[in-house]
Amino acid sequence: MSTQNGMYYSLLEWFKTLNLNAPHANAEELADGVALAQALNQFAPESFTNSWLSKIKSSAVGGNWRLRMSNLKKVVEGVYEYYSDVLNYTLQHDFVKPDVQAIAEKCDLSELERLLQLVLGCAVNCAKKQSYICEIMCLEEELQANIMRALQELESSTRQTTEGGVVSSLSRNSLSGMLDGNAKALEERDAMAQKCFETEKKMLLLIDEKTNLQQELHKLQLEFARLEHNTIGDDGVSLGPIQAGSVRYNELRRQLELVKEELLQSEGAREDLKIKAQQQETDLLHMQQRIDELMKSTAELTALKDEVDVLRESTDKLKVCEAQLETYKKKLEEYNDLKKHVKMLEERSADYVQQNAQFEEDAKRYANTKGQVELFKKEIQDLHAQLDNESSKNVKLEFDNKNLESKTLALQREKDNLLKERDNLREAFDELKCGQLSTNSGSLTGTTMSRELQPPAMMDKMQRLEAENKALREGQGGQTALAQLLDDANKRCEHLREQLKTANERILSLSHASQSDDPILKENEFSKQIKQLMELNEQKTLQIEESATQNSTMQCKITQLESTLATREQELMAYEVKYRKCIERAKEVIKNIDPRIASVMEANNLEKSVDVIEEESKTKMSGMEEQLMASAFYRLGVNAQRDAVDSKLALLMGSGQTFLARQRQSAPRKPLTTMKSK
């Protein structure tokens, strides 16, 4: 096993311990991605579902590297989604993403090592992590060290968003302690095995010695029997009979004693060896019992260490749960406040809905009055036209009145002048009758009489004109003076033309008055007409003043309504801000209720539903605001128009009309009662 690929082979040995249907003994069998997908489905079936597993093509085992690459892409994407969505881990840039093309084409061991490292991270963070950790602990020490190093590299290259690390269940302290305890137990086991081996060797040696001693004893017995029955020595000399006191007997007796001593020594050695063998057997039994006890103690120690780790995790979880419980209590209080606030908002929204319904009913009712309003508009337009005609007539009558007054004054003056001229003519006629004059004098008197018959104003004008003509003839040298004189002359000509027009009008009026029989009645009629015109003028001025006051009141009402609308809009904005805050708090409460059990998909669904509710509430509130503003503006316009129509009708029903005209006019209606806004 090379040092460069030691981690890969360690991960492969761990992967071989998994119970999978697909072959997974070497890199070529892992390069198709089927075994990896089955392992992920075994680790987290809720994330790597059967439908996802069905997308992995098992036919990619052949030589089609493109199908294998597509399978590996699906596996890598699924692993990255599992890390980001379920475990809330983000892999940093120092951890290079496995190159699926290199794995599919060349079975690159380094890339496959990174992929197996990611799969190992999924295994130690799934729901069944305790069983997989126990399987890792049952491997060899070197494999465990390499797997631990792979997990540490994965932890250093990941950045977690929630509490805990990548290898939450295998903390460094607990795992190092477990490894130390396991190493000590293995050393004790090796020492006991060495002792057992040595005792077995000693037993074999003692058994061999025992067999050798038995063989020697058998030989000695045979030799003793031979020597006992043999009468000839080794050198061929006859030993003689064996009798007491004989040399042979003594020699045999001496040999027998020597043999007995040797036998006693061998028996003592045998007994010692037996005792030693029994002691060694008892020691071996004790050692085996001690080994069994140590094995049990190691198993119990591992179980106790697992329990200690579980208890530590449970204590950590308990502390976290206590902190979360305190936060949940605070959030529950806030949630109750939010519930109360939401109830108030719902009540207000219900009130707004009722107001909107009432406004809609009012709008339906007012739709029936649209025709009448249009008729009133037409009548108002006709009345305005009549008012314009009457105002023009009033102006004409005022002008005629002034003309008549000037005419009456001129007529009185002319009447006085005519009376004076009549008296003068009578005197002149009397003088002509009395005196006798010559024709020249008569002609002169005729010319003088014709001049006297002319009015004095005309004479003054003629004289003034003659003087101006003389001045003009004399001052022809200066053009500026001539221009000024021409302008003055033109102005005077225009003034004279106007005077001629007025004179002609007076002549026509005098002729009409002379034709009439009773001028006093006509003067009375003229005075009555003038009085009526003055009254109409006063009424029109009153109407204008009242319309001005109504306009000012309407402007005040409009400003008040605009201010109320602004305040309502500010209130609605404040309510929207509070509503958003409430929704955000509710989101946080929902997220923090059980973040370990609640999946990310449920949180996303909740956020989407909350966003949909916010959009619906915004659209409803905006629609209600538009409807309320439209109905309020429509009602304001209708009331203002009705007040204007009623005021004009009331003015038209004044003293300037007859009884029948008053009966023909429609009575003003009562103003509509506006609804009070809550």
UniProtKB/Swiss-Prot annotation:
GO MF entry, a single one: dynein light intermediate chain binding
Record has Coiled coil as a keyword: yes
Coiled-coil ranges (or none): 135-435, 479-589
Subcellular localization: Cytoplasm, Cytoskeleton; Endosome; Synapse
Primary location: cytoplasm
Region (Interaction with microtubules): 1-155
Annotated signal peptide: none
Residues covered by the Calponin-homology (CH) domain: 5-123
Keywords per UniProt: Coiled coil, Cytoplasm, Cytoskeleton, Developmental protein, Endocytosis, Endosome, Microtubule, Synapse
Any one Pfam family match given in the protein's UniProt record, by short name: HOOK
Self-association state and partner proteins as the record states: Homodimer. Interacts with microtubules via its N-terminus.
Function: Involved in endocytic trafficking by stabilizing organelles of the endocytic pathway. Probably acts as a cytoskeletal linker protein required to tether endosome vesicles to the cytoskeleton. Involved in modulation of endocytosis at stages required for down-regulation of membrane proteins that control synapse size. Not involved in synaptic vesicle recycling. Required in R7 cells for boss endocytosis into multivesicular bodies (MVBs). Has a role in regulating adult longevity.
PANTHER family cross-referenced by the UniProt entry: HOOK PROTEINS (PTHR18947), PROTEIN HOOK (PTHR18947:SF39)
Name this polypeptide is given: Protein hook
Species of origin: Drosophila virilis (Fruit fly)
Gene name, Swiss-Prot/TrEMBL: hook
